[in-house]
């Protein structure tokens, strides 16, 4: 009788990938990166084990939003003080906080809980074209579509 393969956390081999966000649509980029962080692209994917790879995203400031979302999409946050609801448009986020904009989109697509927090630590986002992870010898990852 055959048994289903279950990966163990100490047996997982992790690769490093570089993804260029220039000209990419935010949601499509985020869903594919979230899939890499989860490890769903591997044949050894196990839902309860972090089998994902490390992802470096460069050129976050050049990500693309479709339609009129640059002006219409609003990001909300709360300061935890009375009357402390703050809001920013997607245009403000892209010009002032491009890293946070991409991280929010990707983290929203990861599992909620301990495993999702562990997966999100393998995400590195940079606004420009430079990154400090050359020592890891990252592979360039070509997005589908």
From Swiss-Prot:
GO terms for biological process: negative regulation of translation; translation. GO terms for cellular component: cytosolic large ribosomal subunit. GO terms for molecular function: mRNA binding; structural constituent of ribosome. The keyword Ion transport does not apply. PROSITE patterns: RIBOSOMAL_L13. InterPro entries: Ribosomal_uL13, Ribosomal_uL13_bac-type, Ribosomal_uL13_CS, Ribosomal_uL13_sf. Pfam families: Ribosomal_L13. Keywords: Ribonucleoprotein, Ribosomal protein. Belongs to the universal ribosomal protein uL13 family. Part of the 50S ribosomal subunit. This protein is one of the early assembly proteins of the 50S ribosomal subunit, although it is not seen to bind rRNA by itself. It is important during the early stages of 50S assembly. PANTHER family: LARGE RIBOSOMAL SUBUNIT PROTEIN UL13M, RIBOSOMAL PROTEIN L13. This is Large ribosomal subunit protein uL13. It comes from Bacillus cytotoxicus (strain DSM 22905 / CIP 110041 / 391-98 / NVH 391-98). The gene is rplM.
């Amino acid at each position: 009788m055959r048994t289903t393969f279950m990966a163990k956390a100490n047996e997982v081999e992790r690769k490093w990938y570089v993804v260029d966000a220039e000209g990419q649509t935010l949601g499509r980029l985020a869903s594919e990166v979230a899939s890499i962080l989860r490890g769903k692209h591997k044949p050894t994917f196990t839902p309860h084990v972090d089998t994902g790879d490390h992802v470096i995203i460069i050129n976050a400031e050049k990500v693309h939003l479709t339609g009129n979302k640059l002006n219409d999409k609003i990001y909300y946050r709360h300061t935890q003080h009375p009357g402390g609801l703050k809001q920013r448009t997607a245009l403000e986020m892209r010009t002032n906080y491009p890293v946070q904009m991409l991280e929010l989109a990707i983290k929203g697509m990861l599992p909620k809980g301990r495993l999702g927090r562990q997966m999100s630590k393998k995400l590195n986002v940079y606004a420009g074209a430079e990154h400090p992870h050359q020592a890891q010898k990252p592979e360039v990852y070509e997005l589908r579509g």
